[in-house]
Amino acid sequence: LNRHFDDYKLMANHNDFAGMVKQIEFDKSEPQFYFLNLGETHYPFMLDPKNMPHISGVHGVFKRMDDNLGEETQDKFFDDEQMRDLHKQQIRCVEYIDEVLDDLIAKAPLNTHFVITADHGECFGEGGYFGHGPIVHEKVLEVPFLEGRKR
């Protein structure tokens, strides 16, 4: 992600959108392009880490692999209640992002054009899957798209 940009900043924590908003500076004298890659809505959804189930090394998607292998594994797949809790936690993360986005919009000069989207959706038990890619699943393909100019 750090190629072809005039500047690249990597935050110390992958879920620090508020820190990005604090650091961002708008120069009204010339057009600028910012790409902000947010981690708050990604597993393990650690906005509030209290009692959140966690499987080490999970990235992408998996499907009850321990059940399918017929072998005991140290890490178990999430049960239905844990899956619901993870989904609720992700929703809380999105609500938090929405609040911080208000701060970014307030900080931006008039006539700033915003495009808000995502690179993937997320499965929370649909079809037995948890996570995203490398699968083609309806939930993984669902992404928001909002755009507009601050007036």
Where are these regions (language model features)?
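Catalytic domains that recognize anionic headgroups
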Residues: 1-151
